[in-house]
Each structure stands twice: as C-alpha cells, then as structure tokens.
Amino acid sequence: GTLVSLKWDWFDSEENLWRIPPETSGLKRKMGEGEEHLLPVSPEMRRLMDELFEINGCYEYVFWSPNGKNHPYLNRETINNHITNLGYKGRLTSHGWRDVIVTSGQEELKFPLDIILRQIGHTEHKQGTSGHYDNTEFLPERREFVNQWSLKLVNNGLKI
C-alpha cells in the first residue's frame, strides 16, 4: 500500500533514503504515534528513481495516476494486476514479496531478521517493556542489506 502512495518530497537526496511519515497508510502506525519509516536506497534503485523523476518529477506522487481527478496515484491493485498478467496468479501478490525478501534475506544473504523486518516497516521490536526503549534503526546494516538485495536482483537478470 505504501509503495504506490510515495511522494517525491519524502525522498531525502542528501541521505539517499525515503522518509515516510508515520501516518502513511500501510505502515500500521496510529496517527500521531511512532517515527517516520526510513528506507535506505541502493545505487541501483537511485538510478531508477532518477530516471523516473525525469519522467514524472513534476507530479506530487512517484507513481502518479493519469486519472488524477479521481485518484492522485496508482490504484493499489495495479501491481497485483500486473503480477497476475505475468502469470503468477495465486502464487504471488505484491504483499507476498515481503515473504520473499524476509526468507531470501536470511537464507541467501545471511542478514539477521531484525534488520530485514525494520527495512520492510515492521515494528515488533517496539513491543513489550524493552520495546519502549528500543529506537534502533540499524541504518548502516539496512543500507548494506538493500545494496546486497539489489545486486542479487541484478545478478539474477534484472535490467536496470
């Protein structure tokens, strides 16, 4: 849900990361609670973003909709419809990529679960007594994770 509603002004080009407000739909944070979700960007992703900005940087949303009067950004089901059209109906959804990232991140890239869960926006670490004090972001580790994840995709044939 959060992906299609990304706004260009949430991107911090100096830090090379997204700063997603806590109240953004899909983050499962209550209004007024929590911190912004920081998402480091790999060099490969940055190149894609720069190309996309050349095309639609004049719009508020990264994935703006040509039907902007009714909805300013792509419908949340657009990605799932594309996955279906690629022949993965019943086997993969946009939300299902989280399973792929968590599993592959641990098994193939050997990253700890805490790093991966923070990258995908989960807040389990904030539960319980110790969670009240846990404000770790693991940004350097997460940046390394997204760099390795991007390289894995490129090495497996993704064209950027």
Model-identified regions with their sequence ranges:
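Conserved tyrosine-mediated DNA breakage-rejoining catalytic core shared by Y-recombinases
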Residues: V4-E51, E124-K126
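Active-site-proximal structural scaffolding
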Residues: G1-V4, F11-S13, G32-G34, S42, ...
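Catalytic-site neighborhood detector that most strongly recognizes the C-terminal catalytic loop/helix
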Residues: I20-L27, R46, K110, I120-L158
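Active-site/catalytic core of tyrosine-dependent DNA strand-transfer enzymes
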Residues: P40-G90, V100-I101, L109
